[in-house]
Amino acid sequence: MPSIILPPKPTALQKPHLNLAVIGHVDNGKSTLVGRLLYETGYVDEKAFKEIEEMAKKMGKEDFAFAWILDRFKEERERGVTIEATHVGFETNKLFITIIDLPGHRDFIKNMIVGASQADAALFVISARPGEFETAIGPQGQGREHLFLIRTLGVQQIVVAVNKMDIVNYDQKRYEQIKAEVSKLLKLLGYDPSKIHFIPVSAIKGDNVKTKSSNTPWYNGPTLLEALDTFQPPPRPVDKPLRMPIQDVFTITGAGTVVVGRVETGVLKVGDRVVIVPPAKVGDVRSIETHHMKLEQAQPGDNIGVNVRGISKEDVRRGDVLGKVDNVPTVAEEIVARVVILWHPTAIGPGYAPVMHIHTATVPVQIVELVSKLDPRTGQAVEQKPQFIKQGDVAIVKIKPLKPVVAEKFSEFPALGRFALRDMGRTIAAGQIIEVKPAQVQIK
């Protein structure tokens, strides 16, 4: 049976590549909208989709067909049909867009942090349905939390899809109300809402996704695909040392160990001698593959599977980082970071021990010192060595990882220098690393 989602067409690989995080509160229609985008751009296998549609009809759940594209794909992925199938992509006129970390995992926020740290842009999906919108951007809403996260993780470009317009009868007033409230939130986060497209869509019916809808005569902006086409692919740092955080590791019969990840900086070539840290294991690159195509070399932004000789699957795990032996990624003994406290019920002092999510790694850490508290607007220190910090504060802190992890200065390697701290099932803080005290690493 063919995979439900088709691999990139030859035309796609000629286009600049952009990684897109799809964010928003649960049940606001992220999966349906992603399914619709893939379908409208010709990236869904017709035959497999017909089966899904018929099944949905039989069960009286026609509205679920587009969301089920991703469910079917996830099942294929769990059965191990392909090695780098964690990503799906589609084309606009100018770009090839990879959707990172598909929505719908229970662990979504955790995966979303990993995903957002690799994102060049974000699609924020918000439901127009009464109650759903209010919950999503309320104080406990994931929609609000996701926006805070991508802001802190450095995602500058956003498009907003106001979804489920069919449920509110394409009411312009409701659209304007949502646009105004989301704009307020975006402004608070330092975005300029006048530069952000808000598109009234229905993922289920297809309004304004690929073609202009007659149901919204009052709307004269771009369609969703046109809006996504306005994203600027970021410059790719090819001249920096190689860094590739590992997302997954497999053993493939007849091939050996394959590590999967996205090249953040530098260039990786077949034949390179590489090192994976923290385990400090050395190996040689046998082959590189992306979306079922063999590559001689991979550049920043490429999501790849790398076949490494000399390293066994047991030696490597998600969160390790691949680099070259002549410039080994930094394993951190201690870091100094600027953090913003997004949520905490009381106050945070030295000794506080949350979990850090940094690139693809998750490690327990301890805050060992509060260095200073900053004015969020100017970045100037307003208090040295505060006793505690609380929700809304911005501070410089010293953090000690309780297990080995790779961390770099944000100014040198942005994707390995930004992180989130989580505790109690919530994102407590997000931060950027200013300094790293390196740990001793013995290359094996």
Swiss-Prot record:
Residues 202-204 are annotated as: G5. Residues 101-104 are annotated as: G3. It is an enzyme of class 3 (hydrolase). SUPFAM superfamilies: EF-Tu/eEF-1alpha/eIF2-gamma C-terminal domain, P-loop containing nucleoside triphosphate hydrolases, Translation proteins. The keyword Cytoplasm applies. Pfam families: GTP-eEF1A_C (PF22594), GTP_EFTU (PF00009), GTP_EFTU_D2 (PF03144), GTP_EFTU_D4 (PF14578). This is Elongation factor 1-alpha. It comes from Pyrobaculum islandicum (strain DSM 4184 / JCM 9189 / GEO3). The lineage of its organism: Archaea, Thermoproteota, Thermoprotei, Thermoproteales, Thermoproteaceae. The gene is tuf.
